[in-house]
Curated annotation (Swiss-Prot):
A single GO molecular function term of this UniProt record: metal ion binding
Organism phylogeny: Bacteria, Pseudomonadati, Pseudomonadota, Gammaproteobacteria, Enterobacterales
Reactions this protein catalyses: IMP + NH4(+) + NADP(+) = GMP + NADPH + 2 H(+)
Family: Belongs to the IMPDH/GMPR family. GuaC type 1 subfamily.
EC number: 1.7.1.7
Organism encoding this protein: Yersinia enterocolitica serotype O:8 / biotype 1B (strain NCTC 13174 / 8081)
Active site: C186
Swiss-Prot/TrEMBL keywords: Metal-binding, NADP, Oxidoreductase, Potassium
HAMAP family noted in UniProt: GMP_reduct_type1
Protein name: GMP reductase
Length: 347
């Protein structure tokens, strides 16, 4: 046993210090980024925000809408190959280029992933997703996927430390997914005592990834657009959002009615709700590590995406970054004891 004494920070522990700027308007800020990925060599340009691969968020409908904003969607792994086939036939390649095919790490998952990718060459992204990216089995699966799919962009995770980011990149990942426990409906930190404050994880993992020519995605911990800006400011190349995109028309959560008001259920993918839906219940050897919440229906996701992107542009103008890529170079974090004036409630 040992204790690391250094302070680790989450998004709520800091604010971004404003700086002199030559920008006259938020409209001058360019959010699109261009990447050439380490292993696949593929060039991609777009707004580096990703809808999370949760079965109530990473849906086909979400992918269609977000593609119109040049935003990615990690489509959840529970659609059948037949459902994927119908989707591929229905949408243009411009949508498919903004889609990640999510997979688990079993042999059946691998076979299913290959069948889905064979449906269209426009499907370029793979998201290999497990709660604990530190297992040898996960690394072996990543190596197997890289060997089978040399031209695909592989996003793999989740981890929170630099040495594991390096191992995953050297094993074939183009992008490493960073975050253990920060999600809005994740209870891993409560159930296990394991985790890492998200901003510090992003800063440390970005440094490790960029040293090897890889990228990271900050997964979890964002509850407002300012948190998204902080993630990019901390060095994240992509930011993945679940709760901020939940409860919209494009989601597939079950709708319930209470006292005449309708709500949509949103739950973590290790919650009892998720395990009942997909594997028949919680296995007797494990505990659920997610919760279920009821969200008021929020309408179309369009307005939420515009709000997030507007907040990002504004953050860039406050520090003089004309392009999103410049935000991390222009960011100085200050530690704070409060985030906002709550006299009329939280914004």
């Amino acid at each position: 046993m040992r204790i690391e004494e250094g302070l680790k920070l989450g998004f709520k522990d800091v604010l971004i210090r404003p700086k002199r700027s030559t920008l006259k308007s938020r409209s001058e800020v360019e959010l699109e980024r261009q990447f050439t990925f380490k292993h696949s060599g593929w060039n991609w340009s777009g707004v580096p925000i990703i809808a999370a691969n949760m079965d109530t968020v990473g849906t086909f409908r979400m992918a269609e809408v977000l593609a119109s904003f040049d935003v990615l969607t990690a489509v959840h792994k529970h659609y059948t190959v037949e459902q994927w086939g119908e989707f591929v036939k229905r949408v243009p390649e411009s949508v498919l280029r903004h889609v990640m095919v999510s997979t688990g790490t079993s042999s059946a998952d691998f076979d299913k992933m290959k069948q889905i990718l064979a449906l269209s060459p426009a499907l370029k992204f793979i998201c290999i997703d497990v709660a604990n990216g530190y297992s040898e089995h996960f690394v072996s699966f990543l190596q197997k996927a890289r060997e089978a799919c040399p031209d695909k962009v592989i996003c793999a995770g989740n981890v929170v430390t630099g040495e594991m980011v390096e191992e995953l990149i050297l094993s074939g990942a183009d992008i490493v997914k960073v975050g253990i426990g920060p999600g809005s409906v994740c209870t891993t930190r409560v159930k296990t005592g394991v985790g890492y404050p998200q901003l510090s994880a992003v800063i440390e993992c970005a440094d490790a990834a960029h040293g090897l020519g890889g990228q990271i995605v900050s997964d979890g911990g964002c509850s407002v657009p300012g948190d998204v800006a902080k993630a990019f400011g901390g060095g994240a190349d992509f930011v993945m959002l679940g709760g901020m995109l939940a409860g919209h028309d494009e989601c597939e959560g079950r709708v319930v009615e209470e006292n005449g008001e309708k709500f949509m259920l949103f739950y973590g993918m290790s919650s009892e709700s998720a395990m009942k839906r997909h594997v028949g219940g919680v296995a007797e050897y494990r505990a659920a590590e997610g919760k279920t919440v009821k969200l008021p229906l929020r309408g179309s996701v369009d307005n939420t995406v515009r709000d997030i992107m507007g907040g990002l542009r504004s953050a860039c103008t406050y520090v003089g970054a004309s392009h999103l890529k410049e935000l991390t170079k222009r960011t100085t974090f200050i530690r704070v004891a409060e985030q906002e004036n709550r006299v009329f409630g939280s914004n």
